[in-house]
Amino acid sequence: MRPFQFSKPRFLISLVILVACGFAATAFAEEPKEWLGKNLDDLVSLYRQFHASPELSFREEKTAARLAEELKKLGVEVTTGVGRQGVVGILKNGAGPTLLIRTDLDALPVTEKTQLPYASKVSAKDKDGNDVGVMHACGHDIHITCLIGTARYLASHKDDWRGTVMFIGQPAEEIGAGALAMLDDGLFKKFPKPDFGLALHVDSSMQSGKVGYRAGYILANVDSVDITMRGKGGHGAYPHTTIDPIVQAAQLVVNLQTIVSRENSPFEPAVVTVGSIRGGTKHNIIADSCHLKLTVRSYSDKVRKLLLEAIKRKANAVAAGAGAPEPMIEFSDATPATRNDESLVS
């Protein structure tokens, strides 16, 4: 997984500034692109600092503190600790609508191997106690920089717009828990409920300088599935005396691929990916269990339901065919699809 590069970051930050100002703007005294050209070096430096100092989900203490510090410098009213590490900044500028601009804060348990001068050298314990590298491999460092750049422009060009801007630093996006934590902590009870919401996500598959957007679905439902295939362990030289969970897991991996290709309509986007298989400890020992971790992506509720029910059915069928106990199946990290408001996008 390669990091996102700041080859042409001006397009990302300009996009946010233009849309943020556009909801209540007059003529610009200074065009956002002109301002960005003057301030780009400082923003790139800021990005590299965030990139070199990543933090895992719900551990974003330094990241949240730095975001809060940058916003306070601009005269933004800042509240920290919303939903644990969440940051809320309010910039008021007269009567007008309220716009929410949001960034995610957390990084991934990925070891960086880019050899860049600002590469992450951070390591940590994951939730299972394993030693892992930590990296902004999903571009949240860029997202934070875009938000700060937008805040700097808006704070220094108040004659160009009217209204209230709410800047949100959301923790734990990667585990699908941070937004809910902020809502449960009274986000829209303690602070204004916005008329509009704006966010972006970098995409390394797009040509540098291009921006992609559309009305309707833009990001998929995300479901995580943990499956434990159970069996009867024993010696590898006597497999006939065992019920091999690793063979079950192998069969299940293949069977799962027929859900998308044979049970789902080709006109409905869907993905079922097995990201991890773990079972056994030695060459000559058949384990008692084998664990699989899946990610499931879809847009509609109908397809989402089809995929999850089919996964459960196929796992149970494999176990039954092997004469094994029923597998343990856990669904978690459910995050609904993002659907862009057609009136705002068109």
Name each model-derived stretch.
Residues 1-9:
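N-terminal secretory signal peptides that target proteins for export/translocation
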Residues 30-136, 145-162:
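Acidic/His- and Gly-rich active-site-bordering loop/insert found
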Residues 73, 250-346:
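Metal-dependent amide/peptide-bond hydrolase catalytic core
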Residues 12-24:
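Bacterial N-terminal signal peptides
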Residues 79, 98-102, 166-169, 197-199, ...:
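Structural recognition of the beta-strand scaffold that forms the well-ordered cores
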Residues 40-47, 64, 68, 151, ...:
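Extracytoplasmic/secreted envelope proteins and their assembly/folding machinery
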Residues 119, 123-135, 141-142, 154, ...:
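Histidine/acidic-residue-rich, glycine-tolerant segments that coordinate divalent metal ions
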